[in-house]
Regions:
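Cofactor-binding beta-sheet edge motifs in enzyme active sites
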Residues: 4-166
Length: 166
């Protein structure tokens, strides 16, 4: 079973609920496969992240707790980059001189739960630092499309599409 099928199974993808919207995306880099499903609900017509499922095939996992923490962090970073982060430049240098002018995701905007599971195999360990961020962006965009009916092509979504997480 491929990781995309596994994450869809774990997230109960085929269950249809009119108030719950799910998006899926998969990615491969550094010899690691990652698939993400995000679950979004609308609260006063604004999206709220409920739960994220993530399947990872990165070979032998030496430190499962540390690996899970890395994946969770990259998912939250991916959500933050997709929704809020934008580097602005003027005359060849960054407008942002400190973090007070650069938007980050807030704790209240993070998913209520992230479930990470690893494919168990005997393959040599591979990369784990980057692979979960890109599919988090894609899964979020797909879930927001299902929730709002609008495709999101430009980041940050909050600026270009006037969507903000509650």
């Amino acid at each position: 079973m491929c990781i995309r099928d596994r994450v869809k199974e774990k997230s109960d993808w085929d269950t249809n609920a009119s108030t719950v919207h799910k998006g899926v995306a998969a990615y491969f880099c550094h010899s690691t496969y990652v698939a993400v499903v995000m679950e979004v609900i609308l609260k006063k017509n604004q999206p709220k992240l409920k739960k994220v499922w993530c399947a990872v095939d990165c070979g032998i996992v030496i430190n499962k707790e540390g690996a899970t923490n890395m994946i969770e962090g990259r998912i939250i970073d991916g959500i933050g980059h997709a929704m809020y982060s934008e580097l602005k430049f003027e005359n060849g240098s960054s407008v942002h001189k400190n973090f007070d002018t650069y938007d980050f995701i807030r704790h209240r905007q993070s998913p209520s739960e992230i479930e990470v599971f690893f494919v168990e195999n005997e393959i040599t360990p591979t990369g784990l630092g980057e692979p979960a961020l890109p599919p988090a962006v894609g899964a979020l965009a797909n879930a927001l499309y299902k929730a709002t009916g609008s495709r999101l092509y430009h980041q940050p979504f909050s600026k270009h599409h006037e969507i903000s997480l509650v």
